[in-house]
A protein has these predicted regions:
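N-terminal binding-site loop/beta-alpha segment at the start of enzyme catalytic domains
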Residues: 1-68, 126
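Acidic-and-aromatic substrate-binding clefts and catalytic sites of carbohydrate-active enzymes
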Residues: 17-23, 43-53, 74-81, 108-109, ...
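Short, acidic/polar
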Residues: 20-33, 78-93, 145-154, 223-228
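Hydrophobic residues in well-ordered beta-strands that form the structural core
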Residues: 42, 71, 189-191
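A short, structured active-site edge motif that brings together acidic residues
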Residues: 65-77, 99-103
Length: 277
């Protein structure tokens, strides 16, 4: 499965555009990420669409530095998937989406996953058409614990290059069998929610003490370094997507991504137990 080449860190844009009346700081962060040459991850729905506004402002300042992008695309119906792809390209001034993160909004039988596994259907045909038109270069499927087995099977379709999932020191959002298949088959995986600022939600906060102890044992200066090293330790993970609206935090991400050394086998074993607990 030949996926486009990623850098270890991908800039997540979810925090941009929260205050659309004043985007000066957001623009400074985007400019620095563009200068660094990292991939970007975004969605047309972030912050009621104002995230795309910030990105477009920055892109139009220097079109020569427009990054490669992973963009969320909802795939519940033919009109929806077509609209989201065409609209994202129009709003950001892009010729194509480099990697479409296909997010299923339809769990009923016959959805996109079923069509990819079963030999076709209108959604799979539309995805093929968008690729043939050059509007989508590659595509990955978003995993959840409920759909991960089916999604991994669907990657055998010629329309899919890999998967995305929430994956970090506290979380691995797929079944044990799906994760084993990802590793064994070499399916490229993009990790969402780096936890570069440490535990940020109720689920990961419940594991914060154990994470802090592992961070100390590994000799990492902070959670950003630990989680970039964790991603570098797992061959299946092609990049980890970490969001920030802080210039200092972005610099920390970029520093941590430079020659990130894999963690020890002992630490990795402890991380795996924490992920699945």
């Amino acid at each position: 499965m030949q996926m486009l080449a990623f850098m270890p860190y991908t800039f997540g844009s979810m925090s941009l555009g929260k205050n659309p009346a004043d985007v000066a700081q957001d623009l400074a962060v985007v400019r620095r990420a563009m200068e660094a040459g990292v991939w970007f991850h975004s969605s047309p729905t972030y912050n009621q669409g104002f995230t795309f506004m910030v990105l477009r402002f920055a892109f139009d300042e220097n079109r020569s530095q427009v990054p490669k992008m992973v963009i969320k695309v909802r795939d519940a119906s033919v009109p929806l998937i077509r609209f989201e792809v065409e609209d994202s390209c129009r709003r950001l001034g892009l010729d194509a989406i480099d990697v479409a993160q296909l997010v299923s909004m339809d769990q009923r039988p016959g959805n996109l996953l079923d069509q990819l596994r079963g030999g076709g259907g209108p959604l799979a045909d539309e995805l093929a058409s968008l690729r043939a038109r050059g509007l989508i270069r590659q595509a990955v499927l978003f995993l959840t614990p409920e759909n991960s087995d089916a999604a991994v099977e669907a990657t055998k379709s010629g329309l899919i290059e890999g998967v995305t999932l929430y994956w970090n020191a506290c979380q691995r959002d797929c079944s044990h069998t799906a994760w084993a298949a990802i590793r064994e088959q070499g399916i490229p995986a993009l990790a969402l929610r780096t936890l570069g600022g440490g535990p940020s939600d109720q689920f990961s906060s419940a594991k914060s003490e154990e994470l802090a102890e592992m961070l100390k044992t590994a000799g990492c200066r902070n959670a950003t370094e630990f989680n970039l090293r964790l991603a570098a330790s797992e061959p299946a993970i092609r990049t980890t997507i970490g969001g920030t609206a802080s210039l200092a935090h972005l610099e920390d991400y970029l520093k941590a991504a430079t020659n990130a050394a894999p963690l020890s086998a002992d630490i990795l074993q402890r991380v795996e137990q924490l992920q699945i607990r």
